[in-house]
Amino acid sequence: MIKSSNDLWNYVEKTEKRKDARTAKEFKITLPCELTNEQNIKLLREYLKKNFTDKGIICDFVIHNDKDNKNPHAHVMITTREITLSGFGKKVRSWDEEKTLHEWRKDWAKVQNQHLKKLGLKSRVSHRTLEEQKNIMIDLAKKAEDAKDFDKSILYLAKAIELDRPPMQNLSRKKWRSKEGQEQRKRDQAIRDRAKQDARAVRLLRGVAVVDVASFTVHPLQKKEQ
């Protein structure tokens, strides 16, 4: 019986014939700050069960955070071979495919949003990159503009502006605690805050102006004659 992580990975290594064989895939998962540690454990277990253990993949994870709850994340290790009735089977190469990785990211966002909604929280996450999300908002703004729904167009455009920034850098636990890491986080947060302020300023134009999506020029909203 395997009682610890060390026992698990020692056993996995013994099943491999090659000394340089890859025995695990490791990845880091960012957890929502809005959830408690217990809620994040429940969230993570549901996701791992659905995407991995139910499919014969062994998962081993540990959750880390800092004192002010600004960096909750999990380090997850999964086996490269699926479990069968007779033990470890062949290595599943499809787990390395971009399509599979995309589906894992997509479902992680889906499961997170389900938990956030269930807990009555308004925040939501997306598996898409910031650039992809921004382009979607711009397309929606153009469609709203074509439909003469200028208020909705402004809302979509404001969201696009909020998303028009580089992603916050993913820092290791060691670097997060360093002075350099904290300075980097402050710079990233400042850029994010400025984007939010710019978006807020655009939202204030609703009802008083029209923003041309293509040229991003602002025109006063003409009042209807009495």
Stretch-by-stretch model annotation:
Residues 24-26, 56-60, 71-75:
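Broad gene-expression machinery/nucleic-acid interaction feature
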Residues 1, 5, 13-15, 37, ...:
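Single-stranded nucleic-acid nicking/binding segments centered on His-rich, glycine/basic loops
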Residues 19-20, 51, 65-69:
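A general structural signal for short secondary-structure junctions and capping/turn motifs
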Residues 10-38, 42:
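Active-site acidic/histidine clusters and adjacent loop/turn architecture
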Residues 17-19, 49, 85:
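Homeobox/homeodomain signature
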Residues 30, 77-79:
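Short hydrophobic/aromatic beta-strand micro-patches
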Residues 31-63, 100, 104-111:
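A short, contiguous, amphipathic alpha-helix enriched in charged residues
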